[in-house]
Regions:
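Short alpha-helix
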Residues: 81-103, 122-129
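Class I SAM-dependent methyltransferase SAM/SAH-binding core
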Residues: 1-28
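Short catalytic micro-motifs in class I SAM-dependent methyltransferases
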Residues: 25, 37, 41-43
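A short, conserved alpha-helix within the catalytic core of class I
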Residues: 43-58
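Conserved Class I S-adenosyl-L-methionine
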Residues: 102-176
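Conserved beta-strand signature within the Rossmann-like core of class I S-adenosyl-L-methionine
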Residues: 57-73
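A short acidic, Gly/Pro-enriched loop at the edge of an enzyme's catalytic core
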Residues: 30-37
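Short strand-turn motif at the edge of the Rossmann-like AdoMet-binding core
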Residues: 43, 64-68, 80
Length: 176
């Protein structure tokens, strides 16, 4: 389930048998029958995920969380707060929810048509209120892009964690 129609169309084009793509708000679209499994990729607070999963899933849930603590595209050091693997582990320990976790990395880079597009990207995603990157600093972050159409690339190896949780281990109080 995703709120973005393009994501759903892309998934449907490569659909795996037995997987259903749904466009909408996960909290508003409660299934008639609980799902066998749910995947929450870089999705919200752990408490919200547990609440949704307890109501909507009878099997395993998979949480993909960032395994770093600060925003990657900000000029200054800006905390991600409770949207990290460390925060998720703390919540699961506090609530006594057993889980397994696997750490891995994935390339989450961004291609750009121009240096100006890269500058707009950094301006948009900079969460630092007091610091900005100069044009030269931005250019220094870029490598050769994948094609003539996209001559610039910002490599970004993202450290992630995959948490696996049985929904039966989530207390009924979490579903409220």
């Amino acid at each position: 389930m995703d709120a973005g129609e393009l994501a759903i169309k892309t998934l449907e084009a490569h659909l795996i048998k037995g997987v259903t793509a749904i466009c909408g708000d996960v909290e508003a679209l409660t299934p008639k029958e609980p799902y066998d499994a749910m995947v929450f990729c870089l999705f919200g607070r752990t408490e919200d995920t547990l609440r949704i999963a307890r109501k909507q899933c009878r099997g395993k849930i998979f949480l993909v969380k960032r395994d770093y603590s600060h925003h990657r595209f900000s000029a200054g050091k800006v905390s991600l707060g409770e949207y990290t693997a460390g925060s998720t582990e703390a919540v699961l320990h506090e609530k006594g929810v057993p889980y397994t976790v696997e750490r891995f990395t994935a390339e989450f880079g961004q291609s750009f048509r121009s240096l100006e597009a890269a500058e707009r990207f950094f301006a948009l995603y900079n969460r630092s209120r007091s610091e900005t990157l100069s044009k030269d600093e931005i250019k220094a972050c870029l490598t050769a892009g994948p094609s003539e159409k996209f001559p610039y690339y910002l490599p970004h190896e993202k450290a992630l964690c995959l948490f696996t949780i049985e929904t039966a281990a989530i207390s009924k109080e979490e579903a409220v």
